[in-house]
Amino acid sequence: MLLQPESSSKPRNDSPPGFKFHSSCDTCLKAKIKCSQAKPTCARCLQQGRQCVYSPYRKIGRPSTKNLPLDQLQQPKGRTAGGTARRSLSRRVSLASPGIENGSRVGNVRHATNRVLHAQESVLVPSQTWSDQELTGNINRLDYGLEGTNWSALEGLLDASMSTLPQADHELASAVPRLDQVHDLDPNPGQEDLTGYLSPSSLSSRESLATTFPPEAEAGSFGLSSEFPFSAGYSLGTGPVLSESLNAFPVLSSFPSSASSPVTEARGFNLLSAPTDRCTFQCYPVLINILNDMNEFQRKSSGLPLDVLLNLDKRVRKVHETILGCPCCLVSCAAALTLMLITMVNINLLSLFERSCGSTDGGSGSSMSRGELNVAPRIAFGGGNYAGQDRSRNPLPYTTGHLTLGNIHLDETVKLVFSRRLVRLYLERQLGVVQQLSQLLGRVEGDGASIKVTQDLLRDQLRRLEHFVGFITLTD
């Protein structure tokens, strides 16, 4: 007699091993009614036209040992006193290990967890954690170490800035350090030398001052007097505008001028951003070189021709735009000192313009105290008849060079009008620069000495600029 196998009441389950499905479909389980348990569609889902889905059971508890590898089955299963700590560490490692996420089964995850656990037990390396304050300090710290900088070479600049408020310009000039003192700005004393980051052209800028310009300029441009040991890079002709010291870094020509865009949001930088790298523009050495050049002019002469002043102003504007695009020198911990140096350069340039007012033939007359502009020439040039007047004393910076339009030499009347217009444009541009620097200084956090000195210098510069503009208006 043949024995037939008993038919099971449960539906046949063709699922892969390790998965067990519900006997009733999801629709019947949700409605809490009896399911016909027919596959692939039960009677109720077939009648209502719904999709019949049988969901697997949710695994509860520890996984089955049938899916574990052979080497795991051979390990002893005895419990130890450290079993609880082992399981706790295993769970932490399984969550923190990135390679375990690729495992598809619980057994593989357990096997990978045990391997990571053995590696953690053999070599235990403590993880280094940083607090928020330490991270902030590490981000805001410059690579070249401003904290350990020896600022002894800048003490003369700071003292000179404070002493210029009641004193004359030559006292400020005497306090500016020489170019050979730039090595005192070494950010890491005893380890590195700043001359390693300076190009040979930057180091030879002082020798370029000894190169005298030809006594008479070519026709078609303002002439430079041979009395001033000025480099050929300052000419208004076809030569380069910037001196050799500025060739050490690229000029950011994409930035607009300070007069056209006094608002700093258009430049796209943030004073509180972290430095990206070491300063590649050599902003501080370039500013020191410019101050040294101004010191030479103030020491050798009481006034400069207008063409020299305008070229010097163009050089300062190029450096100003480049420094405002430097992410290292305008970081929060260095912005105050950078803005103070820029303001000192602008004030020294304004002093050169003031000293050139009332000079004889553009640079060889008597010197004037700062802020004491000579208004007597208004009487000499009254009535607008400039051509027949005596040019022995000039109310504004002036040059003896010829002003040409093509091949035509313009007379002194037209040249005087152009000179006054150029000086007025310089003053209006400087008013925009003062406003821009004031906005940048307002974003710097803290109340250090550099911020207070810069605020005083900006107020003094604004007062002198307004006085200069009023003087030009009165002499028109």
From Swiss-Prot:
The keyword Transport appears for this protein: no
UniProt keyword annotation of Transport present: no
Ranges in a coiled coil: none
Any one Gene Ontology cellular component term annotated for this protein: nucleus
InterPro entries noted in UniProt: OAF3, Zn2-C6_fun-type_DNA-bd_sf, Zn2Cys6_DnaBD
Xref: SMART domains: GAL4
Compositionally biased spans, kind Polar residues: 64-77
Region (Disordered): 63-92
Matching Gene3D superfamilies: Zn(2)-C6 fungal-type DNA-binding domain
Protein name: Transcriptional regulator claA
Organism: Penicillium crustosum
